[in-house]
Curated annotation (Swiss-Prot):
Originating species: Alcanivorax borkumensis (strain ATCC 700651 / DSM 11573 / NCIMB 13689 / SK2)
Annotated PROSITE patterns: G_TR_1 (PS00301), G_TR_2 (PS51722)
HAMAP family in the cross-refs: EF_G_EF_2_B
Pfam families: EFG_C, EFG_III, EFG_IV, GTP_EFTU, GTP_EFTU_D2
Molecular function terms from GO: GTP binding; GTPase activity; guanosine tetraphosphate binding; translation elongation factor activity
Function: Catalyzes the GTP-dependent ribosomal translocation step during translation elongation. During this step, the ribosome changes from the pre-translocational (PRE) to the post-translocational (POST) state as the newly formed A-site-bound peptidyl-tRNA and P-site-bound deacylated tRNA move to the P and E sites, respectively. Catalyzes the coordinated movement of the two tRNA molecules, the mRNA and conformational changes in the ribosome.
SUPFAM superfamilies given in the database record: EF-G C-terminal domain-like, P-loop containing nucleoside triphosphate hydrolases, Ribosomal protein S5 domain 2-like, Translation proteins
Principal subcellular localization: cytoplasm
InterPro entries reported in the protein's UniProt record: EFG_II, EFG_III, EFG_III/V, EFG_IV, EFG_V, EFG_V-like, EFTu-like_2, G_TR_CS
Designated gene of the protein: fusA
Protein localization: Cytoplasm
Protein name: Elongation factor G
Top-level taxonomy: Bacteria, Pseudomonadati, Pseudomonadota, Gammaproteobacteria, Oceanospirillales
Length: 699
C-alpha cells in the first residue's frame, strides 16, 4: 500500500515538562484543534483524554505515555497535511524512566514550562535526558494568564539554569489577567484568538505600541540567530542587514536541528491561546524522521555497527519502547518503526532475546481509542497486539536481516517493600500481576526473599511503588498488604585481601574437596564484578575455574555483612589445590564462596547506603524549617537559589531518612513547598547506622 503521508511530513514529538506546567492540557488542546477530540478534556475535572488510567485522572498527574496520531495543515491551512505522532510523557520524578523511554524514540520535543514558576527541578532532569539523546526541541511557556507570569524571565532562567540558547520567535501581548495574545516575530503580526469559539478562529492586527520596541529588538536577535544557520545566510545578513521570512525560517530550522538553539513560544493552553501557533512551529522547525541521524545497531556478531536509514526500502527494524496492559485487548507493545515495513500477520525476530514473534493485529492509537491498521511504515509509531516475550527496550527486526538497536539503560531500583496477598485467591493472581507490571516497567523489579519467602518489589521511589500496588488492585483485582519500605543497601570492600577458601568433606567414600587462594581488590563501584585467573602449574584444573567464579559471584550477590550485594570487587584466583577423586565443581564453587566470606574482615567490608539528590522548592517564609528538617535527616545542603517558584534548596540526603518526606514537607509549609528526588550515588553508611542495619538483619 502506498504511503498516505510522505516521510518528510511526519513529526514524531514528545511533550515533556515539570509536573504542573500544564503539559496534559497543552496536549488536549492539540487534539482538539487537530480535530480528534470534540470536547476538551480538562485535567481539573479528571477528564483529560491523554490521561487514560483511572489513577492518573484521580491524582491529576500523567503516568504512562500514551501515543496519539493527529494531522495538521496549519493555522491558515498553509501546509500540506502533516502527520504528528505525539507521545505524552510524565513529569513526575519517580517516572523519569518513562520520559527516558519516550525521548529515546522521538525525533523532536516540545518542552512546556509554567509562565509563573519557570524552570523547576524536574525540568532539569528532563532537559538532561533530552540532551543525552540529542533531541531537537522548542519551548512553550504556558500559563501566561497566571499571576506572576513573565515570558522574558522564564527564557532567562532556561539560559541560566539549563545552559540552553533560547531564541524567542513570539512575544506575549500582556500577561496575567491581561494576557491577550502573541506576536509572531517572524511575520511581525499580533495574533488574537477568539474566546467565543475556544480559540478556533483568530484575527491578526498590528503590534501594540507599548511592546513594539521590544519586539523589534527580539526580531533582530532572532534574525541574527537564523543567519548563523548557514554561510550564505550570514553573508546576506551582513550585506543587507536583514533576511526574508522564509530565510529566517530556514536558518532557524538548521540551528534547531543541529541542537544549537531552542525556540521560545508562549501562550495559555487553558485559555486556548497559542496552541495552533505551537503546532505550526512543530511542522516548521522540528525534524522529520529522515532528518535525524540514522539509527545505529549491532549485527549478530556483536561487533559490526550498521546504520539503518529511515526508509521503507530498508529491512524492517523497530524498537519496543513501551508495554501496556489494555483492558480490552490484553498486552500492547508500542513500537517505533525506524526502517522498512511491517504488515499485520508478519513474523519478526526479537533480536535481543533471539526469539521469533508473530505480529497479530496492529493498532493506531489515539489516547484511549484505537483504529486497526494493516501495516506500519518507517517513521510510524503504533501498537502491536499479542506479542509474547517482548520487554521494553527490545528490538524487533526482519528475520533475514537481524540487528540489535541500541539498548536503553535502566536505573537500578533504590527502594523495596514486601507485599503479601490478603487471601489464597490473591496469591496466584498477584504473581501474574507483578509479572505483567515488571514486563511493562523495567525500573520495577520483583523477587522472592529466600529466607522469609516474602515477595519483595523494588522501584524508583515511594510514589512509583504506591502506584504499582494501586494498579495491582484496580487492574488485576489483587488485594495485598504492604510492608514498611526497605532501603536497597549495598556492601563493598575498602581494601585488598589475600585469602584461602577451603571446602573439604572426607569421611570415607566419595568426598568433597576444593581449595582456592584468591586475591580481592576494590575497583570502581560502578563496574561489574571482574574475575581473573593466574594459575600456574595446574594447582587448580582449568575445568573448575568457572565453578570458582560462580561461587565467588554468588556470595558477592548474597553479601557478607547484612545480606546485600557487594559492589566494586575484582577477584584473582592465583593458587589452590585439588584431589584426584574428591574434587568436583560443587566443591570448588563452595570454596569460592568461602573465600569471599573469609575476606570480609581483612578486606574491610563496609555497608553502603543510597544517597539521593533532593531539591526542595519552598516559599521564603518556610525556608528555615525546611533547611533544619533536611539537616536532621542527615542531609548535606549543597546550595540554594532564588527562582520565580521560590527558594530552591539542593541537598544530598540518605534515602533511609526520606520516607514520608512528602507528608512532612506539606505540613511544615502548609502545602506550599514541593520537592523532587533522584538517586545520586552509594556512600559509606555511618557506623551507628550500619550497626543498626546489620544487627537488624541478623536478629
Amino acid at each position: 500500500m502506498a504511503r498516505k503521508t510522505p516521510l518528510n511530513r511526519y513529526r514524531n514529538i514528545g511533550i515533556c515538562a515539570h509536573v504542573d506546567a500544564g503539559k496534559t492540557t497543552t496536549t488536549e488542546r492539540i487534539l482538539f484543534y487537530t480535530g480528534v477530540s470534540h470536547k476538551i478534556g480538562e485535567v481539573h475535572d479528571g477528564a483529560a483524554t491523554m490521561d487514560w488510567m483511572e489513577q492518573e485522572q484521580e491524582r491529576g498527574i500523567t503516568i504512562t505515555s500514551a501515543a496519539t496520531t493527529t494531522f495538521w495543515q496549519g493555522m491558515d491551512q498553509q501546509y500540506d497535511q502533516h502527520r504528528i505522532n505525539i507521545i505524552d510523557t510524565p513529569g513526575h520524578v519517580d517516572f523519569t524512566i518513562e520520559v527516558e523511554r519516550s525521548l529515546r524514540v522521538l525525533d523532536g520535543a516540545v518542552v512546556v514550562f509554567c509562565g509563573s514558576s519557570g524552570v523547576e527541578p524536574q525540568s532539569e532532569t528532563v532537559w538532561r535526558q533530552a540532551n543525552k539523546y540529542e533531541v531537537p526541541r522548542i519551548v512553550f511557556v504556558n500559563k501566561m494568564d497566571r499571576a506572576g507570569a513573565d515570558f522574558d524571565s522564564v527564557c532567562n532562567q532556561i539560559r541560566k539554569r539549563l545552559g540552553a540558547s533560547v531564541v524567542p520567535i513570539q512575544y506575549n501581548i500582556g500577561a496575567e489577567d491581561n494576557f491577550k495574545g502573541v506576536v509572531d516575530l517572524i511575520r511581525m503580526k499580533a495574533i488574537f484568538w477568539n474566546e467565543e469559539d475556544m480559540g478556533m478562529t483568530y484575527e491578526e492586527k498590528d503590534i501594540p505600541d507599548d511592546i513594539k520596541d521590544r519586539c523589534d529588538e527580539l526580531r533582530e536577535q532572532m534574525t541574527e540567530a537564523a543567519a548563523e544557520g548557514s554561510e550564505e545566510l550570514m553573508e546576506k545578513y551582513l550585506e543587507e542587514g536583514d533576511l526574508s521570512n522564509d530565510e529566517i525560517k530556514a536558518g532557524l530550522r538548521q540551528q534547531v536541528l543541529a541542537n544549537e538553539i531552542v525556540l521560545g513560544l508562549c501562550g495559555s493552553a487553558f485559555k486556548n491561546k497559542g496552541v495552533q501557533a505551537l503546532l505550526d512551529a512543530v511542522i516548521e522547525f522540528l525534524p522529520a524522521p529522515d532528518e535525524v541521524k540514522a539509527i545505529q545497531g549491532v549485527l549478530p556478531d556483536g561487533e559490526t555497527v550498521e546504520a539503518r536509514k529511515s526508509s521503507d526500502d530498508e529491512p524492517f527494524s523497530a524498537l519496543a519502547f513501551k508495554i501496556a496492559t489494555d483492558p480490552f485487548v490484553g498486552s500492547l507493545t508500542f513500537i517505533r518503526v525506524y526502517s522498512g515495513v511491517l504488515n499485520s500477520g508478519d513474523s519478526v525476530l526479537n533480536s535481543v532475546r533471539e526469539k521469533k514473534e508473530r505480529v497479530g493485529r496492529l493498532l493506531q492509537m489515539h489516547a484511549n481509542s484505537r483504529e486497526e491498521i494493516k501495516e506500519v511504515l518507517a517513521g510510524d509509531i503504533a501498537a502491536c497486539v499479542g506479542m509474547k516475550d517482548v520487554t521494553t527496550g527490545d528490538t524487533l527486526c526482519d528475520l533475514k536481516n537481524p540487528i540489535v538497536l541500541e539498548r536503553m539503560e535502566f536505573p537500578e531500583p533504590v527502594i523495596s517493600v514486601a507485599v503479601e496477598p490478603k487471601s489464597k485467591a490473591d496469591q496466584e493472581k498477584m504473581g501474574l500481576a507483578l509479572g505483567r507490571l515488571a514486563q511493562e516497567d523495567p525500573s520495577f523489579r520483583v523477587k522472592t526473599d529466600e529466607e522469609t519467602g516474602q515477595t519483595i518489589i523494588s522501584g524508583m521511589g515511594e510514589l512509583h511503588l504506591d502506584i504499582l500496588v494501586d494498579r495491582m488492585r484496580r487492574e488485576f483485582k489483587v488485594e495485598a498488604n504492604i510492608g514498611a519500605p526497605q532501603v536497597a543497601y549495598r556492601e563493598t570492600f575498602t581494601r585488598g585481601a589475600d585469602v584461602d577458601g577451603k571446602f573439604v568433606k572426607q569421611s570415607g567414600g566419595r568426598g568433597q574437596y576444593g581449595h582456592v587462594k584468591v586475591k580481592f581488590e576494590p575497583i570502581d563501584r560502578d563496574e561489574e564484578f571482574q574475575f581473573e585467573e593466574q594459575i600456574h602449574g595446574g594447582s587448580v584444573p582449568k575445568e573448575y575455574f568457572g565453578a570458582v567464579q560462580k561461587g565467588i559471584d554468588e556470595q558477592l550477590q548474597a553479601g557478607v555483612l547484612a545480606g546485600y550485594p557487594i559492589l566494586g570487587v575484582k577477584a584473582t584466583l592465583y593458587d589452590g589445590s585439588y584431589h584426584e577423586v574428591d574434587s568436583n565443581e560443587n566443591a570448588f564453587r563452595m570454596a569460592g564462596a568461602l573465600a569471599v566470606k573469609n575476606a570480609a574482615k581483612e578486606a574491610g567490608a563496609v555497608l553502603l547506603e543510597p544517597i539521593m539528590k533532593v531539591e526542595a522548592v519552598t516559599p521564603e517564609d518556610y525556608m528555615g524549617d525546611v533547611m533544619g528538617d533536611l539537616n536532621r535527616r542527615r542531609g548535606i545542603v549543597q546550595g540554594m537559589e532564588d527562582t520565580m517558584a521560590g527558594k530552591i534548596i539542593r541537598a544530598e540526603v540518605p534515602l533511609s531518612e526520606m520516607f514520608g518526606y512528602a507528608t512532612d514537607l506539606r505540613s511544615m509549609s502548609q502545602g506550599r513547598a514541593s520537592y523532587s528526588m533522584e538517586f545520586l550515588k552509594y556512600a559509606e553508611a555511618p557506623k551507628n547506622i550500619a550497626d543498626e542495619v546489620i544487627s537488624g538483619k541478623k536478629s
